[in-house]
Amino acid sequence: MIRNIVLDLGGVLFRLDREEALRRFAALGVPDVEKMLDPYLQSGYFLQVEDGRMTEPEFRAALSSLAGRTLTYDDIAHAYFGFLSEVDAYKFDFIEEELGDYRIFILSNTNPYVMDFCESDRFLPSGRTLSSFCEKKFASCEMGMVKPDRRFFETMLLEGEMIPEETLFLDDGPANVAMARELGIHAYQPQNGEDWRDKVRQLLRELN
């Protein structure tokens, strides 16, 4: 019996466009950004801001140093939002209309810029925020851990009071799905931007 549904952000609730993000960061003058930005796990300063080792002001200062000029919060936010080619509003309608009997959680490798956006009235046309659709968000930049670190999943299960066998996890990252399954969590790996509603309906019928 499934009681909990855990969703990733990028690739699952957002359609990702890595090339646009690379273009925007390059336009800011950040060198070698293609070596640091990855669809699933970042490296360098981009990893440090995602795993909480670096604060947003520290990250902004580091990128400014790389670019050789002062970058603003809005400069970097605009570049990061290149990743988010589309927020799939219909998926939030699905969560609201069909998943009301389940506990909804977010587990995401993300950064302060994206989290600020998710909690703003710009997130969806309705003005609703991400938090209004879920019981709790487990954001890497706030938790100090990134997927596929086993500890991140174990912390989520503990703090969310979830039983693995009662949990369904959606993530577009192969290593993340593999770790979830290793812990006994039911998992599905959608393609970037996939409409996974019918698949979730099917899985819930099979697992319930």
Predicted segment positions?
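Catalytic-core regions built around general acid/base machinery
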Residues: Y90-D101, F133
